[in-house]
Amino acid sequence: MLTKKQKNLLLFINKKLRASGVSPSYEEMKDSLNLKSKSGIHRLISALEERGFIRRLAHKARALEVIKLPETASANDIYNSFSPSVIKGGLDTENTNLNEMEIPVLGSIAAGTPVEAIQNEVSRIPLPSNLEKNGQYFGLKVQGDSMIEAGINEGDTVIIKRSDTADNGKIVVALIDEHEAMLKRIRRKGKTVALESANRNYETKIFGPDRVKVQGVLVSLYRNF
C-alpha cells in the first residue's frame, strides 16, 4: 500500500507523461507535493520503483515510466480527465444553477456529422451559470461509451466552447478529414495528433496534423437522472 505522498507523486508523474510524453523535473515534483527539498522526491521515487510502480529508463536523464497505478486510483486520476460540471436534475427539471442565456443543441457527437454541416438545431438548453456568457457555446448529445472513464456517459449533453485550438490533454470536438466529428482527448506529439478515448476497450486513433481540426473544447455537461 502506498503512502499518500507516494500516490500523489505517482499520479502527478502519470499526468505529466500523458499530457506531454516527458517526465516532470524534480523541481516540478517537489513543487507539486509542497516539499522543501528534492531529497524527499528521490526517496519517494526509490520507494515507487521498489514497489514496481515506476521504472527509470536507462541512458535517459530524468526519464521515468509508469508501470502501474494503485487500485484505489479513480478514472479521473488515471486519465487526467475532464471532471464534468454536471447540472443536477438534468434538463427536465427547474434548476437554480442556470442563467437566462440559452445555447443550441446541434445533434449527436457520435453521428459522424461535422458541426458546420448541422444547419438545424435540435433544441436549446440553458447555459450553466458557472460559464462565461461572452463565449460561443453549443451542445451535443453523447452516443456510445468511449468516454465513460472521463465521467461522460451515453445520453449526456456535453457543452462545448467553440475554439480552433486546444491544449494537450483537453477533451475536444475534433473534425476528421472534414466529414467526421469525434469527442476525444487530444494529444499532439511531433507530426502526429492522437485522439484518445477514455475507455480501455477503445484504441487511440493517430492522424497527421492536416487531417484534424479542433471545433471546440468540452467545458460542462447536462445529465438526466
Swiss-Prot record:
The active site is at 146 (for autocatalytic cleavage activity), 184 (for autocatalytic cleavage activity). This is LexA repressor. Represses a number of genes involved in the response to DNA damage (SOS response), including recA and lexA. In the presence of single-stranded DNA, RecA interacts with LexA causing an autocatalytic cleavage which disrupts the DNA-binding part of LexA, leading to derepression of the SOS regulon and eventually DNA repair. Its EC number is 3.4.21.88. It is an enzyme of class 3 (hydrolase). The keyword DNA damage applies. It comes from Pelagibacter ubique (strain HTCC1062). Residues 26-46 bind DNA. GO terms for biological process: DNA repair; DNA replication; negative regulation of DNA-templated transcription; proteolysis; SOS response. GO terms for molecular function: DNA binding; serine-type endopeptidase activity. The record marks 111-112 as: Cleavage. Transmembrane segments: none annotated. The keyword Methyltransferase does not apply. It holds the Pfam family LexA_DNA_bind. Gene3D superfamilies: Umud Fragment, subunit A, Winged helix-like DNA-binding domain superfamily/Winged helix DNA-binding domain. It catalyses: Hydrolysis of Ala-|-Gly bond in repressor LexA. Belongs to the peptidase S24 family. NCBIfam families: lexA. InterPro entries: LexA (IPR006200), LexA-like (IPR039418), LexA/Signal_pep-like_sf (IPR036286), LexA_DNA-bd_dom (IPR006199), LexA_repressor (IPR050077), Peptidase_S24_LexA (IPR006197), Peptidase_S24_S26A/B/C (IPR015927), WH-like_DNA-bd_sf (IPR036388). It comes from the Bacteria. Homodimer. Keywords: Autocatalytic cleavage, DNA damage, DNA repair, DNA replication, DNA-binding, Hydrolase, Repressor, SOS response, Transcription, Transcription regulation.
